[in-house]
């Protein structure tokens, strides 16, 4: 195909991607996500098209900047970065232009500046050492062992068989297994070596001969060259002022060692054959059927256990984190003393006092010999912001997003990407597991310092049924994510029909043939490029029952709490006797006490009594005007993308009198609040349903209280730290901050686009 034809074909594909972002035509909506996938497949099958596509995408980015078409900037940035991660042969001039474009975007508001900064950091790394992004991604995702880059990632795919059909579960499992059967460690190491040499040597690299040589090499030889290439790139990336010439010479030595001395820059055939494609292997994915809220914690601990330095016992008790000093105000894990307590067992000279002013004397007030040392972890280490990585502009070059050293000597080398498939009910169960995990961290602080946790969501809804039997809307959160992030809508929300179509297809028993798994490719794209979290407030509800012998219970919800009025009544000597003078009618007499959300952020308590047939408390904004920074919501001490207002919809009964007698009608009233208490004032009982889940239903309720769920690790009480100053005269008193709300992050491509 001529170069002009190639450019025209790629230009048409890019325009198709842009059109689906700019129109809501049903004809285009049916193919949403497919255009982006086919565009990447074109350059994957023919890597020589990559520079042409990068130029086209850069031209469209500059056009969007000049015409202020901001809605296409982030999708185009993600597209070009995905191409650059795989590509070789991109000129320095193209890298510089894209880098300059990203730096210009830093003046724009979030999320544009956030995404642009992340892209600029990765571009700078790739410009300094070509091939670094590809190499690090493959090593981390495939868990290839290397001392110079020890980071590991794993994708945990959770599906609840109660919410997703068995055919869908089987189809997804077969597609994942078929793809991973072709991705052995040897294959991935060949890809890393081949990509690094082609990226550094360019046209001087005989790609076909290199590919054949690597295919014929035994595992031991392959591992030798793999570690040599990784060492060359990582040492080059760690230098303050890397020498491009020295880097190329070092990789040329490896190349000549593979193919022989004649394969230098001037060696080889003058006419090169078409270079073979170097695919980017899909990440290592483990498939799990959801069994309960404890499963997430256990799987994450098992992920850490094999190669970590944590000493995890059978009951998941934690460990002594080495390298922590008490004078850094760090928490105290229980450390079992090895001191026998007998004076003669002390080493010689142990009872001699150190010289005044020596380091040992300065630390004397901070240590004691023997006994059980107990530390309380500082508040900042236990917050979601420090756990999942600060949600903003802070990224570290060469490390997965959110990773780094939280504690001295403790690095977060593991990244767990938890992907859940299902509807709103599955998200409610995930919120329960997330809350349970955070509570465990207050007692067993083993995941936080070692693990970066990223949450992802792909909606899988049941096929549409007739209107008479259709369930309530179960894709509310997915609809919200698609509304605030158009690229999520285009790539993720459109996967549901494709997943059901895959489940209807007969399984293929031939695993030897190479296929293009569309669903797995889109999942992989979302996992890699979805780096911007949207934070959702988790709410806690305290429930009181009509049976006074039954203790109140507490639960949490993420999306919705629905209240229905039961037909049954509780006895007159129950929790709350029926008031006299209350007219009979539909519904129940309710007392509502809530804190009204005001523009001034001043607390204002409102108490009202009314007759209602039901209530719904919604935690997800219903429209774009309620997203991020609404004037009716008090601003929380958290990222600007938080949502901490409940939308309360009350179906109120209105009594009217006319010539025919008394009649009743209903009207829906809506207000917004953060905290609310609701109590039945007559003999009617209530039924509560959390997150639309039939398994999370509470009956015979007379009163309940709803408030933002606090971060389990935070508190308002005082704690005294028995650490003295150098003179041993003062006691430090640490006052914990006001409890922070517990926010659950779900990763998207851009966060909230205003």
Curated annotation (Swiss-Prot):
Residues 343-363 are annotated as: Disordered. GO terms for cellular component: cytosol; membrane; phosphatidylinositol 3-kinase complex; phosphatidylinositol 3-kinase complex, class IA; phosphatidylinositol 3-kinase complex, class IB; plasma membrane. Its main location: cytoplasm. GO terms for molecular function: 1-phosphatidylinositol-3-kinase regulator activity; 1-phosphatidylinositol-4,5-bisphosphate 3-kinase activity. GO terms for biological process: angiogenesis; G protein-coupled receptor signaling pathway; immune response; positive regulation of angiogenesis; positive regulation of MAP kinase activity; positive regulation of T cell differentiation; regulation of natural killer cell mediated cytotoxicity. It is found in: Cytoplasm; Cell membrane. It comes from the Eukaryota. Keywords: Angiogenesis, Cell membrane, Cytoplasm, Membrane. It is a peripheral membrane protein. Pfam families: PI3K_1B_p101. Heterodimer of a catalytic subunit (PIK3CG) and a regulatory (PIK3R6) subunit. The binding of PIK3R6 to PIK3CG may exclude the binding of PIK3R5 to PIK3CG. Interacts with beta-gamma G protein dimers. Interacts with PDE3B and RAPGEF3; form a signaling complex that regulates phosphatidylinositol 3-kinase gamma in angiogenesis. Regulatory subunit of the PI3K gamma complex. Acts as an adapter to drive activation of PIK3CG by beta-gamma G protein dimers. The PIK3CG:PIK3R6 heterodimer is much less sensitive to beta-gamma G protein dimers than PIK3CG:PIK3R5 and its membrane recruitment and beta-gamma G protein dimer-dependent activation requires HRAS bound to PIK3CG. Recruits of the PI3K gamma complex to a PDE3B:RAPGEF3 signaling complex involved in angiogenesis; signaling seems to involve RRAS. This is Phosphoinositide 3-kinase regulatory subunit 6. It comes from Homo sapiens (Human).
């Amino acid at each position: 195909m001529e170069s002009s034809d190639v450019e025209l074909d790629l230009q048409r594909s890019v325009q198709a991607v842009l059109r689906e972002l700019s129109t809501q035509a049903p004809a285009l909506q049916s193919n949403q996500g497919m255009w982006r996938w086919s565009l990447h497949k074109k350059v994957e099958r023919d890597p020589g098209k990559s520079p042409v596509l990068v130029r086209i995408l850069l031209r469209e980015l500059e056009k969007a900047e000049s015409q202020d078409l901001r809605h296409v900037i982030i999708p185009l940035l993600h597209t070009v970065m995905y191409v650059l991660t795989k590509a070789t042969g991109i000129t320095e001039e193209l890298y510089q232009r894209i880098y300059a474009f990203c730096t210009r975007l830093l003046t724009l508001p979030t999320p544009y500046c956030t995404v642009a900064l992340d892209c600029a950091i990765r571009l700078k790394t790739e410009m300094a050492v070509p091939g670094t992004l590809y190499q690090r991604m493959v090593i981390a995702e495939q868990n290839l062992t290397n001392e110079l880059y020890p980071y590991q990632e794993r994708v945990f795919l959770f599906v609840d068989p109660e919410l997703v059909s068995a055919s869908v579960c089987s189809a997804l499992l077969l597609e994942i297994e078929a793809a991973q059967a072709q991705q052995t460690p040897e294959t991935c190491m060949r890809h890393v070596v081949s990509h690094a040499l082609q990226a550094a040597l360019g046209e001087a690299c005989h790609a076909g001969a290199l590919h054949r040589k690597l295919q014929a090499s035994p595992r031991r030889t392959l591992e030798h060259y793999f570690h040599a290439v990784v060492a060359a790139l990582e040492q080059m990336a760690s230098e303050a002022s890397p020498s491009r010439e020295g880097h190329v010479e070092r990789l040329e030595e490896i190349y000549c060692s593979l193919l022989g001395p004649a394969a230098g820059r001037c060696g080889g055939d003058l006419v090169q054959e078409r270079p073979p494609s170097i695919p980017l292997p899909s990440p290592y994915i483990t498939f799990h059927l959801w069994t309960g809220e404890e499963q997430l914690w256990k799987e994450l601990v098992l992920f850490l256990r094999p190669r970590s330095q944590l000493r995890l016992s059978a009951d998941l008790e934690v460990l002594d984190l080495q390298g922590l000093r008490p004078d850094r105000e760090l928490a105290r894990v229980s450390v079992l003393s090895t001191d026998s307590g007998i004076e003669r067992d002390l080493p010689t000279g142990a009872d001699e006092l150190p010289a005044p002013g020596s380091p040992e004397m300065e630390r004397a007030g901070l240590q004691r010999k023997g006994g059980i040392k107990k530390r309380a972890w500082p508040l900042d280490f236990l917050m979601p912001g420090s756990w999942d990585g600060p949600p903003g502009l802070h990224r570290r070059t060469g490390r997965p997003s959110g990773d780094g050293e939280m504690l001295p000597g403790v690095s977060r080398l593991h990244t767990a990407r938890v992907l859940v498939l299902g509807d709103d009910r599955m998200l409610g169960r995930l919120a329960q597991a997330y809350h349970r995990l955070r509570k465990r961290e207050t007692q067993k602080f083993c995941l936080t310092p070692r693990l970066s946790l990223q949450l992802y969501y792909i909606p899988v809804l049941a096929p549409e049924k007739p209107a008479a039997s259709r369930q309530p809307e179960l894709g509310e959160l997915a609809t919200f994510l698609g509304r605030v992030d158009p690229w999520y809508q285009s790539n993720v929300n459109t996967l549901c029909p494709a997943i059901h179509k895959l489940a209807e297809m007969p399984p293929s028993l031939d695993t030897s043939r190479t296929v293009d798994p569309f669903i797995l490719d889109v999942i992989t794209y979302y996992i890699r490029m979805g780096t911007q979290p949207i934070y959702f407030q988790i709410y806690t509800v305290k429930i009181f029952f009509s049976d006074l012998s039954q203790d109140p219970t507490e639960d949490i919800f993420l999306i919705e709490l629905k209240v229905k009025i039961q037909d049954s009544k509780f006895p007159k000597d129950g929790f709350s006797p029926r008031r006299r003078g209350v007219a009979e009618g539909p519904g129940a007499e309710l007392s509502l006490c809530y804190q009204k959300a005001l523009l001034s952020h001043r607390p204002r308590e409102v108490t009202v009594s009314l007759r209602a047939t039901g209530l719904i408390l919604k935690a997800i904004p219903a429209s774009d005007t309620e997203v991020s920074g609404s004037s009716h919501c008090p601003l929380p001490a958290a990222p600007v993308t938080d949502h901490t207002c409940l939308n309360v919809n009350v179906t109120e009964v209105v009594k009217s009198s006319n010539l025919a007698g008394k009649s009743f009608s209903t009207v829906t009233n809506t207000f917004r609040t953060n905290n609310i208490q609701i109590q039945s004032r007559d003999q009617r009982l209530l039924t509560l349903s959390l997150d639309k889940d039939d398994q999370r239903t509470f009956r015979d309720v007379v009163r309940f209280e709803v408030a933002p769920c606090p971060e389990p690790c935070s508190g308002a009480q005082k704690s005294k730290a028995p650490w003295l100053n150098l003179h041993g005269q003062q006691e430090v008193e640490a006052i914990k901050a006001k409890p922070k709300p517990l926010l659950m992050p779900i990763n998207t491509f851009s966060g909230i686009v205003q």
